[in-house]
């Protein structure tokens, strides 16, 4: 009897093995902030372990899907205004809006996509 497991299936099974996947906790601060048009705004995101530069920032408005702003920590998604910028690597990252505009009032999220250590 052939006991070999297809590589694709093995990969899926590994996701369910306790301890096989690293739990990376993300902490964003501040949780809320007050700002006015023209303000410089900085949001910080910290990872519980190094994720290199595998971090994305999203903007979400009520009733809308999240919009990708920044990927790989500092790369600006096409069409996103240059007042948005991202920086950082390892465990600490920042999203900066250089001059807040009325259209920028929204919820912002960071997301890591380094699933394995």
Curated annotation (Swiss-Prot):
Residues 23-45 are annotated as: Framework-1. Residues 79-110 are annotated as: Framework-3. Disulfide bonds join 45-110. GO terms for molecular function: antigen binding. SUPFAM superfamilies: Immunoglobulin. The keyword Cell membrane applies. Residues 72-78 are annotated as: Complementarity-determining-2. Changing residue 72 to D: In IMGT allele IGKV1-5*01; requires 2 nucleotide substitutions. It comes from the Eukaryota. Pfam families: V-set. Residues 46-56 are annotated as: Complementarity-determining-1. GO terms for cellular component: blood microparticle; extracellular exosome; extracellular region; immunoglobulin complex; plasma membrane. GO terms for biological process: adaptive immune response; immune response. It is found in: Secreted; Cell membrane. The keyword Membrane applies. Residues 57-71 are annotated as: Framework-2. Keywords: Adaptive immunity, Cell membrane, Disulfide bond, Immunity, Immunoglobulin, Immunoglobulin domain, Membrane, Secreted, Signal. Immunoglobulins are composed of two identical heavy chains and two identical light chains; disulfide-linked. V region of the variable domain of immunoglobulin light chains that participates in the antigen recognition. Immunoglobulins, also known as antibodies, are membrane-bound or secreted glycoproteins produced by B lymphocytes. In the recognition phase of humoral immunity, the membrane-bound immunoglobulins serve as receptors which, upon binding of a specific antigen, trigger the clonal expansion and differentiation of B lymphocytes into immunoglobulins-secreting plasma cells. This is Immunoglobulin kappa variable 1-5. The gene is IGKV1-5.
């Amino acid at each position: 009897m052939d006991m070999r497991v297809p590589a694709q299936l093995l990969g899926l099974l590994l996701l369910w093995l306790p301890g096989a996947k690293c739990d990376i906790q993300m902490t964003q601060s501040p949780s809320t902030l007050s700002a006015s048009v023209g303000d410089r705004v900085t949001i910080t995101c910290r990872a519980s372990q190094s994720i290199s530069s595998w971090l994305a920032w999203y903007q979400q408005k009520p009733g809308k899907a999240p919009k990708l702003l920044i990927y790989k920590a500092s790369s600006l998604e096409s069409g996103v205004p240059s007042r948005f910028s991202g920086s950082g690597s390892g465990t600490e990252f920042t999203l900066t809006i250089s001059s807040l505009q009325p259209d920028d009032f929204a919820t912002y999220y960071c997301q890591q996509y380094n699933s394995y250590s």
